[in-house]
Amino acid sequence: MKVGIIGAMEEEVTLLRDRIENRQTLARAGCEIYTGQLNGIDVALLKSGIGKVAAAMGTTLLLEHCQPDLVINTGSAGGLASSLKVGDIVVSNEVRYHDADVTAFGYEPGQMAGCPAAFVADEDLIALAENCIQQLKLNAVRGLICSGDAFINGAEPLARIRAAFPTVAAVEMEAAAIGHVCYLFNTPFVVVRAISDVADQASHLSFEEFLVVAAKQSTLMIEAMLTTLAQRG
């Protein structure tokens, strides 16, 4: 088994990268992919860059070059579910774009033309993540993660997203693009992110302060998931 792991930023991949054994690096088109073994599992760790285009391009390179059996998207997110605090975990049941709008042609908010309204995470991977959450005794929410090319900071964009997607649990900038590419490649995926900020008018200050906390929490989750997969054989 080979597991693809995707993080957007250096802070989101550095702890995992440093623990990869027999590490090799592929750099292409602004992306870096690190291959080797982590916790007994063959891994391909992608640092994609920030935003939907970078995430889609990087995920495509990862799937084409490394052919992982599954993909886990890690990193940070802004929490919208009322129970989420900094350091808590959000697990995707599905991902959607919050900045796509072709509703004039009968599509749902966030639905890209010719695509499903949502890209649905793999149930077995969701169960794996939630099992690890219980083992680690972390606070977590399973729910909708919405992505767009904007850092959500302030009342107006927050209200717009909540109005269009009432069940949204978290927002960030890559997950829907990753889910979209995995859907096209028929590759199972799940998004497991730690909360770096609670989306409000001071989100940017919280993000800068707590990104390292979120990175440590999401790394803890990835390592637990890999260990469980290795134990299952």
UniProtKB/Swiss-Prot annotation:
**Annotated active site:** 12, 197
Q: Which reaction does it catalyse?
A: S-adenosyl-L-homocysteine + H2O = S-(5-deoxy-D-ribos-5-yl)-L-homocysteine + adenine; S-methyl-5'-thioadenosine + H2O = 5-(methylsulfanyl)-D-ribose + adenine; 5'-deoxyadenosine + H2O = 5-deoxy-D-ribose + adenine
Q: Which domain of life is it from?
A: Bacteria
Q: What positions belong to coiled-coil segments?
A: none
State a single Gene Ontology molecular function.
adenosylhomocysteine nucleosidase activity
What GO CC annotations are associated with the protein?
Answer: cytosol
List this protein's GO terms for biological process. Answer: L-methionine salvage from methylthioadenosine; L-methionine salvage from S-adenosylmethionine; purine deoxyribonucleoside catabolic process
Q: Which residues of this UniProt protein bind substrate?
A: 78, 152, 173-174
Share what the entry says about its subunit structure, partners included.
Homodimer.
Q: What does this protein do?
A: Catalyzes the irreversible cleavage of the glycosidic bond in both 5'-methylthioadenosine (MTA) and S-adenosylhomocysteine (SAH/AdoHcy) to adenine and the corresponding thioribose, 5'-methylthioribose and S-ribosylhomocysteine, respectively. Also cleaves 5'-deoxyadenosine, a toxic by-product of radical S-adenosylmethionine (SAM) enzymes, into 5-deoxyribose and adenine. Thus, is required for in vivo function of the radical SAM enzymes biotin synthase and lipoic acid synthase, that are inhibited by 5'-deoxyadenosine accumulation.
**UniProt-recorded name of the protein:** 5'-methylthioadenosine/S-adenosylhomocysteine nucleosidase
Q: What is the lineage of its organism?
A: Bacteria, Pseudomonadati, Pseudomonadota, Gammaproteobacteria, Enterobacterales
The protein's gene is named: mtnN
